Amino acid sequence: MGLIVYYSSATGNTEHFVSQLGQRLFKIDKRKPSAFVGEPYVLVVPTYADGEGRGAVPKAVIHFLNEAENRKLIRGVIGSGNRNFGRYYSLASKIIAEKCGVPCLYRFELRGTDEDVICVKKGLERFWKQLG
């Protein structure tokens, strides 16, 4: 299986979710967001936006993806968010998928559900097999 790269804030929702996937994990450190992963990965990212949708992608994730080596290795993105924010729900994953030319594989709310975890595990298994 491939690598999961993720960013999680103080709430820990994203970290909680990815810890249930049984995958190799790499956390983007907001103090050192320019670390290189060196292999293909799927990015799991929360959304943080104001009432106008600004600031949806965490700055540490922007810095991480601005490194050409990291950007060329992204294969897909999974987003988390809060449905209370309506059209801005999981906006970061949509922005990243579009800018990086990769699929948005799944979206989950807050910490996700057991069903979300099962769906993502199965989906990632199929996804990595398809990529070969």
Curated annotation (Swiss-Prot):
Any Pfam family matching the protein: Flavodoxin_NdrI
Cystine pairs: none
One annotated GO molecular function: FMN binding
GO biological-process terms attached to the record: protein modification process
Function: Probably involved in ribonucleotide reductase function.
Entries under PANTHER family matching the protein: PROTEIN NRDI (PTHR37297:SF1)
Family recorded in the similarity comment: Belongs to the NrdI family.
Protein name from the UniProt record: Protein NrdI
